[in-house]
């Protein structure tokens, strides 16, 4: 059974909390287990917590959960691109899969709500599939 870590942004907790619950359910359905969850204030802080989990020998991969809503500036775009690049870099550096379960940028609250199930499932599925490849 694959042992996964999960990092959850608590910003927009009404959305990310539900995404987190659904991700845990999806992992069980897939025959994997989320063994450690780290909550962080916002999506910007996700990469540091991911690194902490990747350094643990008993963690096979990491699921990330967050949502970045559209604001009045391009801040959401800048943050989303920086996070995606850093997560990809960490995955390659540690040789363990890291998912991008962060909805956004450039989405509204309503759009984020509609994506809860899909993004939570994809976040788990991508890590599990990478661990089971070959």
Where are the language model's segments positioned?
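Glycine-rich phosphate-binding loop
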Residues: 48-86
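Phosphate-binding/catalytic loops
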Residues: 105-118
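Short beta->alpha junction loops
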Residues: 36-44, 104
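Short beta-strand segments
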Residues: 8, 64-68, 99-103
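A charged, well-structured terminal subsegment
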Residues: 117-134
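Glycine-rich phosphate/diphosphate-binding loop of Rossmann-like nucleotide-binding domains
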Residues: 1-39
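Short, acidic/small-residue loops that bind anionic groups at enzyme active sites
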Residues: 79-104, 122
């Amino acid at each position: 059974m694959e042992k996964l870590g999960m990092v959850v942004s608590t910003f927009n907790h009404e959305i990310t909390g539900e995404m987190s619950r659904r991700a845990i359910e999806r992992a069980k359905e897939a025959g994997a287990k989320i063994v450690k969850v780290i909550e962080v204030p916002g999506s910007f802080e996700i990469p540091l917590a991911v690194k902490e989990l990747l350094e643990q020998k008993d963690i096979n991969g990491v699921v990330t959960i967050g949502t970045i809503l559209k604001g009045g500036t391009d801040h959401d775009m800048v943050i989303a691109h920086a996070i995606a690049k850093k997560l990809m870099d960490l995955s390659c550096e540690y040789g363990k899969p890291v998912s991008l379960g962060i909805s956004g940028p450039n989405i509204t609250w309503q759009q984020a709500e509609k994506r809860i199930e899909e993004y939570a499932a994809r976040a788990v599925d991508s890590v599990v599939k990478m661990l089971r490849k070959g």
